[in-house]
Swiss-Prot record:
Residues 1-38 form the signal peptide. It comes from the Bacteria. PROSITE patterns: FIMBRIAL_USHER. It comes from Escherichia coli. GO terms for cellular component: cell outer membrane. Its main location: membrane. It is a multi-pass membrane protein. The keyword Cytoplasm does not apply. The keyword Disulfide bond applies. Gene3D superfamilies: 2.60.40.2070, 2.60.40.3110, 3.10.20.410, Outer membrane usher protein FimD, plug domain (2.60.40.2610). Belongs to the fimbrial export usher family. This is Outer membrane usher protein FocD. The lineage of its organism: Bacteria, Pseudomonadati, Pseudomonadota, Gammaproteobacteria, Enterobacterales. Disulfide bonds join C852-C874. Keywords: Cell outer membrane, Disulfide bond, Fimbrium biogenesis, Membrane, Signal, Transmembrane, Transmembrane beta strand, Transport.
Length: 875
């Protein structure tokens, strides 16, 4: 028997696997060290001690194990641990451990800055506020009643601090000290697509599009740029065009929980109509606020007769639980669940008595929690993607503030040379009646013909959640505008009406055509809203619609969508209806569709490994207003071990309508890989044939080189596990480390803990990782690095001899790569990640004579073996 990494005792008979390499993993029988160490209690002494003769007749054959009598499993040093404070996970970080004052155990050394970041109120702890922020202090000596427990096996540090010394922080709060601005890095995101279309007469047209998003991160600054290229060619023509879309520079202003943006951006559209602009903006960022304080939820007040447990439920789910002291209480950190639903509050007193009451509530977009302020300040010049509008300068400011009893006040101002607008509104949570908001905007505008107009616009929003029926009703806009009301974008037009396009022959004015047409004489008058039921357990019924009328004409925009989605076991089906009519459109579009999907797993055993298990059959039928009907049947699913190859095959028939009858067909493949995504497909309908293709991905340049990835999101995580090539990342389709051990997780959640785990089942036989899980908390737009401690090399069962005898049992063996282990009987020790040749140091006591070093050398063929054996002499 011998000891493996981390002081675990292993039996050489428990090793399994061949020496031929491959994917076989070694399995070890892990037994606690204490099982093999005799502990004898002397009647004459109160302390415990190890009797070495229990292990060997020769005491010199056993190392000094007295430290184990004190529970000291590790020597003092720095260890990466998961920190739990009052049973709540806080963070994962390196912590300095030193011997406790009684010399019996390892104690964490924490600075006042660290304790404050964890939620300890440094001003409530006597003397703590006078200490330098980086002073190393003992928790239980600084805070009366505080305790700690270090779980060496799971590398967890459990801390308890009396509530008296804790800050009043919301649930889910992560201190800004833990936010990671990431590393310096350059980013490139690309998305290329193309297709070739051939018609009945043999004509061919080619189209291509490329979007490039580039970026640079330095500290807390983020620079981004967005550019596109388009290409089209056919018989007798060819055209390609580069277009710059936007560029901006941004950073967080942590103290204000806001973001500063300079360059091309857009205004918030919650009070005034949103517009694109080039300038500067400072605006609140709700992502910096804990989840328990985002959105709107009511503040719950009450009185606890004694120490009681409070439980809050919504729609049958418990969303909050805590223990309350006697007296009045206030709860303002409930996680919002949807946009409403009655809250059932239960207080169970220590004597068994129970208080129960309901808090009905609903929310509309403008509602804020009590005491919460949300603002946005913008200034710059208007930007339009076309050539029909000017670029007038403006300044805009909006504000919302939550008041007690469910009230919210909000408003804003918009100032420009040709435009002035002011808004004032109020919102209210009315309990079982729902939530409502009402605001008014007064505007003064000067149009392109130099005419001046004054007008008002009134907006009413309503929301009611019917918990009993699972229905969420929203009347989003009844908005009424007087004839003289115009928006800021209306004043930017160069002409009063029309539509113009830029061609090779210059600007051409054309006649009105569907939604391309604009006419400032037909400004919006009134519009109304939406009815949106919520999801049920196995089905959803939805109905939504809108209606918009205009001054100066009886034409209207209309839209209606209705549908029913349901599932029976794993068979799903849906029935949907759509109606749309634009004011300048001659016809109304109406479409009715039916769709059913049946997975092949419906007929398979639950433990089936067939490739058809991830496949489904689908049938759909559509009917349009002008008589065209289409039927399609097909097959779709995923392949490969990570389900990262998707496929779809469809065949159908179209009849009626303007184009007569024809057969249709469609086939496609979509691949998601660690280095990018690729797609290809073919379709035919009537006399047209189309071949299309696409390629997308990202490139990240950092201090350690270039790493390819799937398309990049706003916030990224760079996985760094040197030498651990081709290792999968858990819960990431198609993402695995490259040949160097690097990978990019293309998406991460801002200001929240992101857990990144490596799939150890995909590790190579010559790779060991100390920490398979890393947690990071990135700021917006950051590229944060998740570092893993890897040991790459040979797994060795080494027999260490000294002066012809095995080194003492329990000796600590340390390799040059930082790995350590404990020698078992016969001087055997298991070490991983070892080079073919090197040196190890051995220590079995506190004296200078109680240590030695050993050189070893393995044959080259050991690199391909699961476990190698070697004997080394220690001097």
């Amino acid at each position: 028997m011998f000891f493996g990494d981390g002081g675990q005792l292993l039996s050489d008979k428990s090793l399994t696997g061949s020496a031929g390499g491959g994917n076989n993993r070694m399995k070890f029988n892990i037994l606690p060290l204490a099982f093999f160490i005799g502990i004898i209690v002397s009647p004459a002494r109160a302390e415990l001690y190890f009797n070495r003769r229990f292990l060997s007749d020769d005491p010199d054959a056993v190392a000094d194990l007295s430290a184990f009598t004190q529970g000291q499993e590790l020597p003092p040093g720095v260890y990466r641990v998961d920190i739990y404070l009052n049973d709540t996970y806080i963070s994962t970080r390196d912590v300095q451990f030193q011997m406790s004052q009684d010399g019996k155990q390892l104690a964490p050394c924490l600075s006042p800055e660290h304790m404050s970041a964890m939620g300890v109120n440094r001003y409530a702890v006597p003397g703590m506020e006078r200490l330098p922020a980086d002073t190393c202090t003992s928790l239980n000596s600084m805070i009366q009643g505080a305790t700690f427990r270090f779980d060496v096996g799971q590398q967890r540090l459990y801390l308890t601090v009396p509530q008296l010394y804790m800050s009043n922080q919301a649930r889910g709060y992560i201190a800004p000290e833990y936010w990671d601005n990431g590393i310096t890095a350059a980013l490139l995101n690309y998305d290329f697509s193309g297709n070739r279309v051939r018609d009945t007469y043999g004509g061919t047209s080619d189209y291509a599009y490329l979007n490039l998003k580039t970026g640079l991160n330095i500290g807390s600054w983020r620079l981004r740029d967005n550019t596109s290229w388009s290409y089209s060619a056919g018989k007798g023509y060819s055209q390609n065009n580069w277009q710059h879309i936007n560029t901006w520079l941004e950073r967080d202003i942590v103290s204000l929980r806001s973001r500063l943006t300079m360059g091309d951006s857009y205004t918030r559209g919650d009070i005034f109509d949103g517009v694109n602009f080039r300038g500067i903006q400072l605006a609140s960022d709700d992502n910096m606020v804990p989840d328990s304080q985002r959105g709107y939820a009511p503040t719950i007040h009450g009185i606890s007769r004694g120490t009681s447990r409070i439980s809050i439920r919504q729609n049958g789910y418990e969303i909050y639980q805590s223990t309350l002291p006697p007296g009045p209480f206030e709860i303002n950190d409930i996680y919002p669940a949807g946009s409403g639903g009655d809250l059932q509050v239960t207080l169970q007193e220590a004597d068994g008595s129970v208080q129960r009451f309901n808090v009905p509530w609903s929310s509309v977009p403008v509602l804020q929690r009590e005491g919460h302020l949300k603002y946005a300040l913008s200034a710059g010049e208007f930007r339009s993607g076309g050539h029909q509008q000017d670029n007038p300068r403006f300044a805009e400011g909006t504000l919302k503030y939550g008041l007690p009893d469910g009230w919210t006040v909000y408003g804003g101002a918009w100032i420009a040379e040709r435009y002035r607008a002011f808004n004032l509104g109020v919102g209210k949570n009315m309990g079982w009646l729902g939530a409502v908001s009402l605001d008014a905007t007064r505007a003064n505008a000067r149009l392109p013909d130099e005419s001046r107009h004054d007008g008002q616009s009134y907006r009413f929003l309503y929301n009611k959640s019917l918990t009993e029926t699972g229905t969420n009703i929203q009347l989003i806009g009844y908005r009424y505008s007087t004839r003289g009301y115009f928006t800021f974008a209306d004043t930017a037009w160069k002409k009063m009406s029309g539509y113009s396009v830029l061609t090779q022959d210059g600007v051409i004015q054309i006649q009105p055509k569907y939604t391309d047409y604009y006419n400032l004489a037909y400004n919006k008058r009134e519009g109304a809203g939406e009815y949106q039921p919520a999801d049920g357990e196995s089905s959803t019924l939805y109905l939504s619609g809108s209606h918009q009328s205009y001054w100066g004409t009886d034409r209207t925009d209309r839209q209606l969508n209705a549908g029913f989605n349901s599932s029976v076991n794993d068979i799903s089906w849906s029935l949907n209806y759509s109606l749309s009519r634009n004011a300048w459109q001659h016809e109304t579009d109406r479409i009715l569709s039916f769709d059913v999907s049946i997975p092949f797993s419906h007929w398979m055993r639950s433990d089936s490994t067939s490739a058809w298990r991830n496949a489904s059959a689908r049938y759909s039928q559509t009917l349009e207003a002008h008589g065209q009907a289409a039927s399609t049947a097909g097959l779709y699913g995923t392949l490969l071990g990570d389900n990262n190859l998707g496929y779809s095959i469809q065949s159908g028939y179209t009849r009626g309508g303007y184009e007569g009858s024809s057969k249709t067909g469609y086939a496609s493949l979509n691949y998601r890989g660690g280095y990018g995504n690729a797609s290809a497909g073919y379709s035919h309908s009537g006399g047209y044939r189309q071949l299309y293709y696409g390629l997308s991905g990202g490139i990240l340049a950092h201090a350690n080189g270039l790493t390819l990835s799937q398309p990049l999101g706003d916030t990224l995580i760079l996985v760094r596990a040197p030498g651990a090539s081709d290792t999968r990342i858990e819960n990431q389709t198609g993402v695995s480390t490259d040949w160097r051990g690097y990978a990019v997780l293309p998406y991460a959640t801002d200001y929240r803990e992101n857990r990144v785990a490596l799939d150890t089942n995909t590790l190579a036989d010559n790779v060991d990782i100390e920490n398979t899980v890393v947690s990071v908390v990135p700021t917006h737009g950051a590229v944060v690095r998740a570092d893993y401690k890897t040991r790459v090399g040979v797994k060795v069962l080494m027999t260490l001899m000294r002066n012809g005898k095995a080194v003492p049992f329990g000796s600590v063996v340390t390799a040059r790569n930082g790995g350590s282990s404990i020698a078992g009987e016969n001087g055997q020790v298991y070490l991983s990640g070892m080079p073919l040749s090197g040196q190890v140091s051995v220590k079995w006591g506190s004296q200078t004579t109680d240590q030695c070093t050993a050189d070893y050398k393995l044959p080259k063929e050991s690199a391909g073996q699961i476990l190698s054996h070697v004997t080394a002499s220690c001097r």
